[in-house]
Amino acid sequence: MIRSPSDVPVRPDTAAGAVRPPRRWLPTGLVALVMSVTVLGGFVVAGTLPAPDVSPIALGGVLTIRPLPGWEVVRRESATVPSPSGTVISGEFAQLTRGSGALDLLALPGVGGTALELADLYAAEVLTSQLERISVSELVERIVLRNGREAVRFSYIGSEPRTGAAIEGSVTVVVAPSGNGAVFDGWAFQGQLQLIGGELVAMIESAEVA
């Protein structure tokens, strides 16, 4: 179980992110993780090209996020996550991609509890079912997003079952006062997580959880 010590500093700038093979949804409907990697391209002089207007994405009346220019929705579907009591929690899953990178989003209406409890559920029921040799950090960071919403963030490392590739990731979890929850899962092949950290943090920081 992941836990949150009182001496963990508040850091609203921690990164997330990377790329993994096509997502596998479990037959039971377990929400899947997919991940993200930034593709490094050429250089453009600041101000030369206007930034395109990107429309916000809304999930389940719970989560609203504005993709950065170049990111687009490539997958969107209903998802369920098993709860410790044996029931299932229904929500909506979406995947944003940019080149070979991706950011997974999970919106869970009325999940209740705390962000730490939802983070523990996600680690136990989703991450462990999708990765082999998974290792999740015992300590989580309590952070405050730019909009003032409190959240928790933890890291993990594991291997992709089909290829054995080492993967590292960072998960940010928010539960609003309404009881609605949101999970932002960013990942990359080991050693590449930092490449997309800035863009992932920017999108998460500007997201709204109703």
Task: Give the label of every model feature segment.
Residues M1-T97, W187-A210:
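N-terminal targeting sequences that direct proteins away from the cytosol to non-cytosolic compartments
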Residues R3, P12-P21, W25, L49, ...:
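Conserved polar/disulfide-associated segments of primarily extracytoplasmic proteins
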